[in-house]
Amino acid sequence: MKELRVNANDAGQRLDRFVGKAVPLLPESLLQKYIRLKRIKVNGKGAKRDTRLELGDLLQLYINDEFFEKPREENSWLKVGTPRLSIVYEDENILLADKKPGVLCHSAGVWDYNTLIANIQAYLAQKGEWRPKEENAFAPALCNRIDRNTGGIVIAAKNAEALRILNDKIRDREIEKLYLCAVQGRPKPPEGRLENFLFKDAAKNQVYVKDKPEPGARSAVTEYRVLCSRGALSLVECRLLTGRTHQIRVQMAHAGWPLLGDGKYGRERFNRNFDEKGQALYSYRLRFDFPTDAGILNYLRGREFRVEKVDFAEKYFGIGDVRSLDRAPE
């Protein structure tokens, strides 16, 4: 039990709003529940959520100690009331989440609980699969990341052994990820390979294409194939053979087929015509190739997973379920 004394700066606030600010890790749903159950008292008595606090009031909070910790990335999951996840696949070792555009994988330098990892950790804690108090160091973790404005499949490991294996497999390129994108124009040829060198200006978070090797530029290879075209747009599937920052976006733009909605590498006037504010790019398909031993994850060898829905595929090409798309040749 913790006690809080209402001072001059706190007086006049509603009880629920005051406690919400004083205990930022406490989810709103739990806050309201604890008020109803009288686990939050004012001067020793239960109170309604809209009770106005007065100078000198003493609050008794019968709340678990972890909610009083300082907010940081590692405990941001505590703030999540009802996890918001779209799960593509789940077993005892891994979880594949369909991250929606606009959602951060991790917090961006400031404390934020509206992240994919916080929702996954809250989901597993609420299911009882992850018990933080029984762990010395491990917490469920993401094995790959996707930019905020890009959607798609993100892999989460539920235990340390799965995390180690998946990190190794990603490093050794034994997990294949394919992307859908909507681009301007009709790529010619309709199936091909883009090969050049990419130089990243970290200060500007901008990537530049170089046709020849030069200091700081890294080779980049993307295979693509056009799935269909409609009007001024084409739906393209891309396979990354290297993993460079903004690789698909910058290579497609350099080839003359910028991604719809791409504010950095696309064409502003074209994007305005469609009123798109985020790049039409989605990591929609994932395959565990695993040509070498995968330990406890060997059962995933050869398995492939896809998301069901990609908004721009439905909006511009009438494809409501992208699982129906023809499989790319292996």
What are the residue ranges of the model-derived segments?
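RNA pseudouridine synthases
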Residues: 1-330
